């Protein structure tokens, strides 16, 4: 007898090692089943991930195999942890099981299966598999079932107690030992009852272990409350378990519908299998065999038990031991497990105890995984799909249709070299005698290769002109190909930008050598070197996959495609942009190829012709988009063709390196065919390399006929051969991609174009082609699809260097016509980066629709929204027919030129309306026709029924004509459920609110949207509130009236009736509540006075005295829910304020909001006052009807967008289409892919007109005859004048230069100082902690500024250094001098600088005893700035600071704040740090909470070498440390606070000894670090701010650890710290950017704050006097002219709206402009000014706003 057990835990081994071993074994031939399991599971997981909401999908990295996720994705954390734990707990044991070498035979009478938790589901995979071969598919479906179960549990957890996507996980399960099930259950029942816990949120038992231990489950917050308040259970031994996924084993939360949902997507062929003879699987709930005749019944039963039953392993053991027929007296019982398990040990013991004669032993089936003997990896192969392509080819073939037209017409487009390349007459000599000339004037050329849309690609005209046109055209064609492919960044798994590669072939640099090289400028390198061609594409599109530039001469582009296929097959990328580039601009290559007798003297390539005399050079740019076939099909891409095989070899046996070799070529074809599994006779067309050289053509025809059409056996079907070079020349590096594009067009058009250039007779060296059934098409040959036979094309591309590459293409798979989708109204979008392109794109789309008015509207909408990259200029229309769309688009043509660009995504608000306009059947159409919305409503309905409420579905699915009485209770419940579902729908579409507000009933949905209440809590509260109203209030005795009048007008007009103000929605939008009689009278009175009124269809007068009977019972119910911290700001109409945290809600908030007046208008006013919302905020109204649009517009003047979610008077599709149009037009990033996902398989990506570029000619003309002369005359050199001597560096802290280097790229200096030196040690001695010297971190400021000044003097000699800022400081360890000063103790300081000294990163390191290794102490960055501009900036709020300082002193005078003297300050400080007298600058201080001000007088410096003396910087700033370490607001018993760093330290004036300063700071808890505090320290001299330390941050440290952390390195603790550097201080959090930096380099530092500190040399500089000219002044005109000159843009084109990035101002050009402004306009700007100043308008504003400080 064999018992197989599957555990609910991972094996005790190293899990990462197990996954690694599974990967290795899966590649071995003897583990084919294991490999298939992983492949099938990967496919299933991908399918399920595709169905996840976008916010969850975005958490997952790209993966090629499920093992990639297991190894690289942290699935133990985050919201999907439970879901993927389900996946891997099923996958791991099954993989171990199928890998074992035993026979796969399990009979019912000899085999028994058991399992716990997810292991129970894993066991079903084996029980449901009739054979080993069936296991992979079965396992995949069990993993699907497990994943859906995990997702179901996650969804339920979110409904009950949601967690943020990046929040810490909390346990849902605790174990209680020593009490027993009965006692624990009594404690649980008592708690649930006494706290009125809603049933779905109740605490329950999930597991009872054999030893009596009990697992208790529940929402984490309630579980904590239970153990802190529940009497007996509280005192029992208990502990949380690592169960984070959510609630399971919960019969009150799940039923059979949930287990059916988990199983329903499994494949029918698996579910229908018969299990009548399968082995038994014992229930983990009671030990009884599961009764299942089919796999469907087995899966549903197992899932139901998992979701609803308590696990009782003891009952399973009892059931086994009680099965006497199974355990005969002398039977050998084999218990087979997958790695050791204590649970099984208990089973074996129980069997041996109950059946002493039974021999039971345990077998580990997983041991095989550790046997590495037979590991021998092999690879896999998948077809590669071409899904997009574009080209620029000779003869005007600037797009695919023009190319096809050229081919069909059989045109030969060779011509003389055009004048824009070079002077063909002077550079051509047909005799070949003249030096460096070509013997042919002919070539094939792209028209105007300089045309480029520089603004689209964020390049200046200057940069564009200096950039090789091949690079520019590569950008254009790459975009066009991507657009044709429907690429949208990160839309799907295979379009994740980090997984997209760029690979291009290129073999010449004509433009660099002959054009740009004539006058080398700043963009010469990035604009022309080959690596920048694919690199520029990757950079622009933000692709992070492999980027290669390939040069294999003439075969470069097809070699690039082959490498791209390999990259995809190996899983190194999921999508690749590939192609070839060749633009001929210089005569050198013409001359060289002529001398080598490659080129034809007579014209184009005479392919196959007996008179062929060489090839004709040609331009060519081609780009294609590649994906694996499975990914392309998954993404609903259009497949243009399939690459079945690709290979490259080398003709090493040829007679010379440039000579072809037919046998090698033939071997290549065979290899490619074998790889693809295709017979040679199935290939109907070979697109040959066919250059028109005698040797090349003869060798290729020999190899082709030998393989594809030998004499014996003769082909039955004709083989056709052709070569595109006869049309457009030999594109060299672009030749292969040109041939490939031609082949794909042949598939598309189902015909073969004629071959041209057979001027004389067929090449006499060819065999008899007719006899071999080989044909050269001389006319258009139809080549339609044939049923049962696929079409194949072989594409050849050979290299003059000997390389040969071939691709085998298969026709694209046929696809049925689109079926459309149930939507009745669709959004169509057009966008561009310029108004010129916008108009042209609009015209192009209109032309397309007029030519094909029967195009599928749904597919048109899908293509223009979900399958397009959207730009800042947008036209958005919606309609129900193509005719309506055309009409709307035509109306937009006239206004397109005035369209405003979207500068940034707007803030988004959700407004949740009340109940006032409820009607039955709300959202019925959306429910019936849009599955995601239906799923959400059904999920919420389950919550309703779990609370004991009636189902909401009848009220939603009923029609208005149906006779269905909707109770007030149901109306409220439906309303809030619809709002929650709509909120989730909008969020799934990428519409994430920044702020939410709800009116009346809508506030409950707003609390859900803000994250403070769960969906379950909201439904429970609304349902209970509605129940109380029905029970305690009289229906229809009171009513409500909406009035368009002010409160004053109403009071003046209505004097004889009793009423209350229920809602004040706007200045003239008020809702009254009163009895029905009074409401009727009031209505008549107001109407008679001309006021607009509307009586609301509500059964109660909400927010009035009618509701008072429910308040106290409802308040008790409301206290049973838990308010969580908000994730989104909430505007509270009750509080008339904005709420940012849950502490702002008073205990009676829900009670008060039920009765209190809805102060909607005041709340919205408050939100505007604090800047949270404005007229640009985009609002989405979420409710059963559009009722709050008027109120929003009344409260926010000039509000632009309020988009409703539903309207009762129109189709749901119409409402949503209009709203989505408005949102998209406003710049909201809608997830259109998610919107169309349910219907995507029924839609098609349309081949619409491509993007219409705003082209301008950017071209450097080649001039002169210097290429002919090649002048090599030597030039005399010159001596550089010696650089001025740098200033001396020796100071107390900076000792000697260890190394330095300076050059054109900047400089580096390394300083080494001895800490035990007397001067250095004296600095440390003035600042002691735990009685030990510790160098003040503010000493680093002096070091930084001294080194920065030195570097500035070396790099910018003769240029005055104005002011410096030392910022981005992060302190990792303290610098503590040794006790033993007999030996040196070194510290090293490294500083780097760019050539402009705009950023000078510094890192400080302790040198270890071996003097080889170092430990990092701190990092920071010095930047240069303008002290006068800081002074002006600070002046704007000086009065606020002085007012606050005076207020603090008044509080101290009143005894409300603490005033402390100097002596007391430093007495208090001694508990943490003991300052020497010269550090004791604070004379007195006032502390109030976390706020303080100190009077400071600085001690004089004895040493004149200081730049920023630490005994000045420390006392002027340590008021923040005083608050935290000595202030009354903090508990100092167990914690001290030490310096973490600061973001910026700058002073406009030098600090002077003896002067009185005031330091003010308010410390606050740091947002991103628990326990940290930060604040801005302001330093005032008089009433003027002269310094600021921004975001000075202190971190907590347990006081008990002071001795350890501040012991000298040569003490016991200090030596331990040196051995373990990471413990020198508590580790800096991972997410602090500077803390990640191991070596401070310019590229690693954040340069967003280029600010500085004043130095003594410039502190007295006076600003320029006089008024500053306005924006039309000569200076502004000079500034515009300078920018125009440097960018190459016409001055008139630099309008106020022009963005600097759009004209190519990048980091490099920004530095150039800053330097030019300083030199030519005498204006000093920060190095990143033009990166941080968006446009010309902002530049003008800056010039005007800084008129007194610019110089």
Curated annotation (Swiss-Prot):
Pathway(s) the chain acts in: Secondary metabolite biosynthesis
Cofactor binding, note field: Binds 1 phosphopantetheine covalently.
Entries under Pfam families matching the protein: Acyl_transf_1, CurL-like_PKS_C, ketoacyl-synt, Ketoacyl-synt_C, PP-binding, SAT
Keyword tRNA-binding: no
Cofactor(s) in the UniProt record: pantetheine 4'-phosphate
Keyword Cytoplasm applies: no
Modified residues (O-(pantetheine 4'-phosphoryl)serine): 1707
Annotated spans, Product template (PT) domain: 1291-1607
Annotated EC: 2.3.1.-
Region entry C-terminal hotdog fold, spans: 1456-1603
Domain PKS/mFAS DH positions: 1295-1603
All copies of domain Ketosynthase family 3 (KS3), residue ranges: 381-811
Domain of life: Eukaryota
Ranges where the record places region N-terminal hotdog fold: 1295-1429
Active site (record annotation): 554, 689, 730, 1327, 1514
Positions of the UniProt region annotated as N-terminal acylcarrier protein transacylase domain (SAT): 19-249
Tissue: Expressed mainly in sclerotia, with expression levels 20-fold and 10-fold greater than the expression levels of this gene found in mycelium and conidia, respectively.
Domain notes: Multidomain protein; including a starter unit:ACP transacylase (SAT) that selects the starter unit; a ketosynthase (KS) that catalyzes repeated decarboxylative condensation to elongate the polyketide backbone; a malonyl-CoA:ACP transacylase (MAT) that selects and transfers the extender unit malonyl-CoA; a product template (PT) domain that controls the immediate cyclization regioselectivity of the reactive polyketide backbone; and an acyl-carrier protein (ACP) that serves as the tether of the growing and completed polyketide via its phosphopantetheinyl arm.
Record protein name field: Non-reducing polyketide synthase afvB
Organism whose genome encodes this protein: Aspergillus flavus (strain ATCC 200026 / FGSC A1120 / IAM 13836 / NRRL 3357 / JCM 12722 / SRRC 167)
């Amino acid at each position: 007898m064999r018992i197989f057990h599957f555990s609910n835990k991972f094996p005790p081994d190293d899990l990462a090692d197990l996954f690694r071993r599974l990967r290795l074994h899966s590649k071995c031939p003897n583990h084919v089943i294991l490999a298939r399991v992983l492949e099938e599971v990967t496919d299933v997981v991908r399918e399920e991930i595709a169905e996840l909401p976008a916010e969850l999908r975005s958490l997952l990295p790209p993966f090629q195999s499920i093992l990639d996720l297991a190894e690289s994705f942290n699935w133990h954390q985050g919201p999907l942890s439970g879901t993927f734990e389900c996946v891997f707990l099923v996958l791991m044991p099954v993989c171990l099981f199928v890998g074992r070498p035993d026979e796969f035979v399990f009979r019912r009478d000899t085999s028994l299966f058991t399992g716990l938790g997810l292991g129970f589901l894993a066991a079903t995979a084996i029980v449901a598999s009739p054979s080993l071969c069936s296991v992979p598919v079965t396992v995949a479906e069990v993993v699907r079932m497990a994943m859906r179960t995990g997702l179901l549990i996650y969804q339920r957890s979110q409904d009950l107690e949601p967690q943020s996507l990046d929040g810490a996980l909390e346990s849902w399960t605790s174990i209680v030992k020593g009490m027993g099930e009965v006692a624990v259950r009594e404690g649980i029942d008592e708690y649930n009852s006494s706290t009125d816990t809603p049933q779905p949120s109740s605490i329950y038992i999930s597991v009872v272990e054999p030893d009596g231990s009990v697992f208790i489950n529940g929402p984490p917050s309630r579980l904590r409350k239970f153990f802190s308040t529940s009497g007996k259970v509280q005192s029992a031994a208990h502990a949380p378990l690592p169960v984070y996924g959510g609630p399971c084993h919960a019969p009150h939360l799940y039923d059979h519908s949930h287990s059916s949902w988990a199983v329903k997507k499994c494949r029918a062929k698996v579910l229908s299998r018969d299990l009548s003879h399968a082995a038994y699987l014992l229930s983990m709930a009671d030990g009884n065999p599961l009764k299942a005749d089919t796999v469907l019944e087995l899966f549903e039963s197992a899932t139901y038990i998992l979701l609803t039953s308590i696990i009782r392993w003891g009952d399973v053991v009892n059931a086994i031991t009680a099965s006497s027929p199974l355990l005969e007296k002398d039977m050998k019982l084999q218990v087979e497990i997958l790695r050791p398990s204590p649970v099984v040990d208990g089973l074996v013991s129980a069997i041996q105890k109950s059946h002493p004669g039974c021999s039971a032993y345990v077998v580990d089936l997983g041991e095989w995984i550790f046997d590495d003997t037979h590991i021998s990896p092999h690879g896999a192969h998948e077809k590669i799909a071409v899904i997009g392509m574009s080209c620029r080819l000779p003869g005007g073939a600037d797009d695919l249709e023009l190319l096809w037209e050229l081919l069909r017409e059989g045109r030969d487009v060779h011509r003389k070299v055009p004048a824009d390349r070079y002077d063909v007459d002077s550079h051509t000599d047909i005799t070949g005698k003249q030096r460096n000339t070509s013997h042919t004037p002919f070539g094939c050329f792209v028209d105007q290769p300089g045309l480029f849309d520089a603004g689209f690609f964020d390049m200046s005209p200057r940069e564009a002109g200096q950039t090789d046109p091949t690079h520019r055209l590569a950008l254009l064609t790459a975009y066009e190909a991507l657009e044709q492919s429907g690429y949208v960044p990160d839309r799907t798994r295979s379009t994740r930008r980090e997984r997209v590669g760029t690979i291009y072939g290129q073999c010449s640099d004509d433009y660099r050598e002959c054009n740009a090289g004539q006058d080398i400028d700043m963009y010469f390198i990035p604009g022309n070197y080959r690596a920048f061609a694919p690199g520029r594409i990757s950079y622009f599109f933000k692709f992070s996959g492999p980027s290669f530039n390939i040069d294999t001469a003439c075969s470069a582009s097809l070699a690039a495609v082959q490498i791209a296929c390999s990259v995809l097959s190996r899983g190194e990328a999921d999508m690749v942009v590939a192609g070839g580039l060749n633009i001929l601009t210089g005569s050198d290559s013409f001359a060289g190829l002529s001398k080598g007798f490659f080129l034809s003297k007579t014209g184009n390539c005479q392919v196959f012709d007996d008179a062929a005399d060489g090839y004709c050079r040609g331009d060519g740019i081609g780009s294609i988009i590649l994906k694996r076939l499975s990914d392309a099909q998954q993404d609903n891409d259009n497949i243009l063709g399939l690459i079945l095989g690709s290979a490259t070899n080398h003709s090493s046996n040829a007679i010379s390196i440039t000579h072809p070799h037919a046998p090698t070529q033939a071997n290549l074809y065979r290899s490619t065919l074998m790889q693809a599994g295709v017979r040679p006779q199935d290939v109907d067309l070979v697109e040959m390399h066919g250059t028109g050289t005698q040797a090349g053509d003869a060798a290729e025809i020999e190899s082709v006929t030998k393989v594809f059409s030998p004499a014996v056996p003769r082909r039955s079907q004709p083989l056709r051969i052709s070569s595109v070079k006869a049309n457009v020349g030999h594109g060299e590096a672009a030749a292969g991609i040109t041939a490939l594009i031609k082949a794909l067009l042949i598939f598309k058009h189902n015909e073969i174009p004629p071959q041209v250039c057979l001027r004389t007779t067929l090449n006499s060296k060819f065999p008899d082609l007719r006899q071999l059934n080989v044909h050269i098409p001389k006319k258009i040959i139809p080549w339609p699809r044939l049923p049962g036979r696929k079409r194949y094309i072989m594409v050849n591309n050979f290299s003059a260097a000997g390389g040969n590459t071939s691709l085998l293409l298969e026709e694209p798979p046929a696809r049925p016509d689109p079926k459309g989708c149930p939507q009745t109204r669709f959004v169509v979008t057009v966008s561009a980066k310029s108004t010129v392109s916008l108009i042209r794109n609009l015209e192009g789309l209109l032309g397309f629709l007029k030519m094909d008015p029967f195009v599928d509207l749904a597919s048109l909408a899908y293509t223009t929204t979900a399958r397009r990259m959207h730009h800042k200029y947008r036209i958005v229309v919606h309609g129900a027919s193509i005719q309506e769309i055309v009409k709307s688009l035509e109306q937009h043509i006239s206004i397109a030129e005035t369209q405003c660009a979207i500068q940034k995504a707007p803030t988004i608000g959700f407004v949740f309306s009340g109940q006032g306009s409820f009607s039955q059947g709300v959202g019925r159409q959306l429910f019936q026709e849009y599955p995601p919305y239906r799923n959400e409503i059904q999920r919420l309905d389950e919550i309703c029924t779990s609370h004991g409420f009636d189902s909401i579905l009848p009220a939603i699915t009923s029609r208005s004509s149906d006779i269905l009485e909707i109770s007030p209770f149901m109306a409220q419940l439906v309303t809030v459920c619809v709002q929650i579902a709509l909120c989730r729908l909008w969020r799934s579409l990428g519409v994430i609110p920044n702020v939410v507000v709800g009116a009346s009933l809508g506030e409950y949905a707003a609390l859900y949207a803000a994250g403070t209440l769960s969906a379950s809590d909201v439904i429970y509260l609304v349902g209970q509130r509605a129940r109380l109203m029905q029970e305690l209030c009289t229906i229809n005795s009171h009513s409500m009236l909406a009035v368009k009048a002010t409160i004053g007008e109403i009071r003046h007009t209505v004097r004889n009736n009793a009423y209350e103000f229920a809602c004040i929605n706007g200045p003239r939008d008020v809702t009254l509540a009163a009895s029905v009689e009074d409401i009727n009278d009031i209505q008549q009175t107001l109407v008679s006075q001309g006021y607009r009124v509307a009586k609301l269809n509500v059964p109660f007068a909400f927010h009035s005295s009618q509701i008072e009977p429910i308040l106290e019972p409802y308040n008790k119910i409301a206290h049973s829910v838990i308010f969580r911290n908000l994730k989104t700001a909430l505007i509270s109409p009750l509080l008339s304020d904005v709420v940012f945290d849950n502490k702002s809600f008073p205990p009676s908030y829900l009670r008060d909001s039920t009765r209190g007046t809805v102060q909607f208008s005041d709340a919205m006013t408050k939100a505007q006052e604090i800047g949270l919302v404005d007229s640009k905020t985009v609002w989405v109204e979420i409710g059963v009807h559009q009722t709050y649009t008027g109120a929003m517009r009344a409260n926010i003047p000039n509000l632009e967008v309020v988009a409703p979610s539903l309207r009762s008077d129109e189709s749901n599709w119409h409402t949503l289409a209009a709203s989505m149009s408005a949102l998209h037009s406003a710049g909201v990033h809608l997830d259109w892919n998610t919107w169309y996902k349910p219907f995507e398989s029924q839609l098609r990506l349309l081949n619409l007109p491509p993007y219409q570029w705003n082209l301008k000619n950017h071209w450097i003309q080649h001039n002169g005859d210097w290429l002919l002369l090649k002048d090599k005359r030597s030039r005399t050199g010159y001596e550089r004048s010696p650089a001025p001597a740098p200033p001396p560096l020796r100071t107390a802290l900076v000792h000697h230069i260890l190394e330095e280097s300076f050059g054109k790229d900047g400089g580096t200096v390394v300083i080494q100082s001895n800490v035990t030196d007397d001067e250095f040690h004296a600095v440390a001695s003035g600042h002691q902690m735990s009685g030990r010297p510790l160098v003040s971190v503010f000493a680093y400021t002096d070091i930084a500024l001294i080194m920065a000044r030195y570097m500035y003097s070396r790099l910018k000699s003769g240029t005055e250094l104005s002011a410096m800022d030392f910022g981005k400081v992060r302190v990792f360890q303290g610098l503590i001098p040794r006790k033993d000063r007999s030996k040196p103790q070194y510290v090293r300081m490294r500083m780097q600088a760019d050539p402009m000294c705009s950023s000078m990163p510094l890192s400080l390191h302790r040198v270890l005893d071996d003097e080889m290794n170092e430990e990092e102490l701190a990092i920071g960055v010095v930047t240069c700035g303008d002290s006068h501009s800081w002074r002006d900036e600070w002046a704007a709020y000086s009065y606020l600071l002085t007012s606050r300082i005076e207020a603090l002193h008044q509080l101290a005078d009143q005894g409300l704040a603490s005033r402390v003297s100097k002596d007391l300050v430093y007495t208090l400080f001694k508990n943490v740090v003991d300052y020497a007298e010269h550090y004791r600058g604070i004379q007195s201080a006032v502390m109030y909470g976390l706020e303080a001000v100190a009077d400071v007088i600085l001690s004089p410096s004895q040493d004149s070498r200081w730049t920023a003396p630490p005994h000045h910087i420390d006392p002027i700033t340590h008021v923040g440390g005083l608050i935290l370490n000595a202030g009354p607001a903090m508990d100092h018993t167990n914690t001290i606070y030490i310096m973490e760093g600061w973001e910026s330290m700058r002073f406009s004036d030098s600090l002077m000894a003896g002067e009185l300063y005031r330091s003010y700071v308010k410390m606050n808890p740091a947002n991103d670090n628990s326990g940290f505090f930060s604040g801005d320290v302001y330093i005032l001299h008089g009433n003027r701010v002269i310094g600021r330390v921004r975001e000075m941050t202190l971190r907590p440290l347990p006081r008990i650890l002071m001795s350890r952390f501040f012991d000298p390195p040569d003490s016991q603790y200090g030596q331990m710290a040196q051995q373990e550097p990471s413990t020198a201080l508590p580790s800096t959090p991972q997410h602090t950017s500077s803390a990640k930096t191991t070596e401070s380099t310019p590229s690693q530092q954040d340069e967003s704050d280029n600010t500085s500190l004043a130095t003594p040399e410039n502190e007295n500089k006076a600003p320029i006097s006089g008024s500053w000219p306005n924006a039309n002044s000569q200076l502004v005109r000079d500034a515009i002219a300078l920018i125009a000159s440097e960018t190459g843009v016409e001055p008139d084109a630099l309008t106020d709206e022009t963005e600097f990035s759009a004209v190519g101002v990048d980091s490099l050009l920004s530095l150039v402009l800053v330097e030019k402004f300083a030199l030519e306009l005498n204006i000093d700007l920060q190095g990143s000014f033009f990166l941080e100043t968006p446009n010309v308008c902002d530049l003008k504003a800056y010039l005007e706003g800084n008129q007194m400080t610019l110089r």
